[in-house]
A protein has these predicted regions:
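Active-site and NAD+-binding cores of ADP-ribose-processing enzymes
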Residues: 2-17, 28-30, 57-152
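Extended catalytic/binding region for NAD+/ADP-ribose chemistry, centered on the ART fold
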Residues: 27-47, 51, 124-128
Length: 152
């Protein structure tokens, strides 16, 4: 399965989960290494844009294409989540789900519903899982955001 990530070119190929360990994420707490990837290039763009300050145009960003094995993916069903799971301030239960996944190390990746686009998915990859050795970077290229996408 090919997944995508957009981020600062200086860190884009770091698959150790160091950024998530430092800052946490919607589905993981600070202190837990994890790698967030998206199911499409377009979703990767949206995941960056929703966090930008108005009028900020990111530069020095890259798009990373990553291949992960499909035989070690656990899926989170929307029906199992609290009603407010899409809220900007995500409920604590989401971090509990992700933290448990990362701690158990039973699967390489956790498929997560996107809070931005219905029927699209993000993935939380556990860099400490043994199958991480099978994860491959396929392509890295500079990425420029179209100025029309930036909040005015």
């Amino acid at each position: 399965m090919v997944l995508f990530r957009i981020g600062n070119c200086n860190f884009i190929d770091d698959l150790t989960g160091a950024g998530t360990k430092l800052y946490g994420g919607r589905w993981s707490s600070v202190g837990k290494p994890g790698l967030y990837l998206a199911s499409s290039r377009a979703l990767s763009v949206l995941e960056v844009l929703v966090h930008l300050q108005p009028l900020f145009v990111p530069d020095n960003y890259c798009l990373l294409e990553v291949e992960i094995p499909e035989d070690s993916i656990q899926k989170v069903q929307v029906e199992s989540l609290p009603e407010n799971w899409k809220d900007i301030s995500a409920p604590a239960q989401l971090k509990k789900i992700g933290d448990a996944f990362l701690t158990e190390r039973k699967y390489l990746a956790l498929q997560l519903p996107s809070a931005i686009v219905a029927a699209e998915f993000n993935f939380l990859v556990n860099p400490l899982h043994p199958a991480m050795a099978k994860v491959k970077i396929l392509k890295q290229q500079p990425f420029n955001f179209d100025n029309r996408l930036i909040k005015q």
